[in-house]
């Protein structure tokens, strides 16, 4: 694995120059984009005033590098490789340039499409869609992940994401194929996940819960459903760590011409009860929702849908966190990932079938997105992380 500077074509350089500011070499906000096909993590500096990007370098991580997360102290980037041997890399973030360098590698038990950390910075949470499991790895005091899994839990079908609440006491994971959100309590003494009571909450059948986001005030949990494009809003009981459904709001308008998606069939040797019937694909265009994000002030929430390649905007009511769908925007083709910068002023979107990233300015009163620019990116762009250093 190596860190190299980009050699851009003349046209790409011209586009970058035109769409970005001159680029401040002392920029303190860095954008990281994993490009699964290329096996690279692209690094950009972001202009804090305009949101424009300057591509700095690319780290050769390995084929199928996909989910990433940043350490609590912002010194490390953890990147998961979904090609064999399955592994997670600990990468040092150069505070001056944003460039990455490998510090450690640890084995993973399966192909993991999701990774996150808790506020303590001592645990790495992963979820395996194909392996129907979640796994927890320890993070050393030096921020490195060097040991194997501390805990592995077999789940229902298609574990797709796993996140901690803002306190680190509770952890939630989605099972897309089983239509449930799992609820855990983190034992502070052992660092192990324990099933909460109840251990799960069901969505409506066929919804396919995918990605989870927790509101900044820790009162609400929002789950994007891949197969129907709903955002399910749950109230979080912070005394018990349990969820209760408040509402379910569509992110895909009826006139989009999409039909509900279909969950994959259960594997032959599965560790949980599988439905008897398997729905056949009728060839109609399907909802294929992907990612969800919320601004740091909790006022605006965004989701992506990959079949139509659009970003949806919701306004979030103060206090109770209820959602109002506002509109949607065209974006990069097959937008698997979005990320909002820590200031809440800019949104970055990637498309798995696009060779460009899009940056949007977020109107601070309405949440409306205005394009800032499009920037070259390696093939198979998916996951995005943004780091602002003090």
Regions found by a protein language model. Give the residues of each.
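Conserved beta-strand positions in repeat-built beta-propeller and related beta-rich domains
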Residues: 33-37, 71, 79-83, 118, ...
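Loop-centered beta-sheet repeat module
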Residues: 173-231
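Blade-loop segments of beta-propeller domains
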Residues: 55-121
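Short loop/turn segments immediately following beta-strands, especially the blade-tip
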Residues: 45-51, 91-98, 137-144, 184-193, ...
